[in-house]
Each structure stands twice: as structure tokens, then as C-alpha cells.
Amino acid sequence: MANTPQAKKRIRRNQARAVVNKNRVSRIRTLVKKVEAAVAAGDKDAAATALKAAQPEMARGVAKGVLHKNTVARKYSRLTKSVNAIA
């Protein structure tokens, strides 16, 4: 248990940041699922639009330290590849 006032404050701050980070990751996951759903449906326009919406959010996740840059690079590469594969 935290004894100093600063340690107690850090616990409060960490809990608040955890909520923000969880929301950010959830938003990214939702956007990725939209791309995957559009690809599964074979809708190239919707998939491309969803990918354009997901990419900056994923980059923001890296900038904020929520996701690792290699993870985002891999996900973005795979999504782009799947969107481009639609006939």
C-alpha cells in the first residue's frame, strides 16, 4: 500500500490513464474489425475507407505508448494486403 502522498497520487493517475488507454485500444480494435468485416464482405470501397480511418488511430496508439510500433506495422501491413487482394 502506498504510504506517501505522492505514491497515492500516482496510483490515482495510473488508474485514470488505464481507463484512457483501455478506451484507445478498444477503439483501435473496433476499427480493425470494421476493416476485416468489409474485406470478408468483399466491399473494396468500404474496406479502403475503414482502413483510412484505422491507420491514423493505430499510429496514435503507438505515439501514446499504448501499442508497440512493430505490432501496428504488422497489423497495418496485413490489413492493407487483404484490402488490396479484393478483386
From Swiss-Prot:
Function according to Swiss-Prot or TrEMBL: Binds directly to 16S ribosomal RNA.
What Gene Ontology cellular-component terms does the record carry? Answer: small ribosomal subunit
> What are the top taxonomic ranks of the organism?
Bacteria, Pseudomonadati, Pseudomonadota, Alphaproteobacteria, Sphingomonadales
User: What are the UniProt keywords, alphabetically?
Assistant: Ribonucleoprotein, Ribosomal protein, RNA-binding, rRNA-binding
Give the source's domain of life in one word.
Bacteria
In which family does this protein belong, per the annotation?
Belongs to the bacterial ribosomal protein bS20 family.
Q: What is this protein called?
A: Small ribosomal subunit protein bS20
User: What InterPro entries does its record include?
Assistant: Ribosomal_bS20, Ribosomal_bS20_sf
**GO terms classed as biological process:** translation
Organism of this sequence: Sphingopyxis alaskensis (strain DSM 13593 / LMG 18877 / RB2256)
- Extract one GO molecular function annotation from the record: structural constituent of ribosome
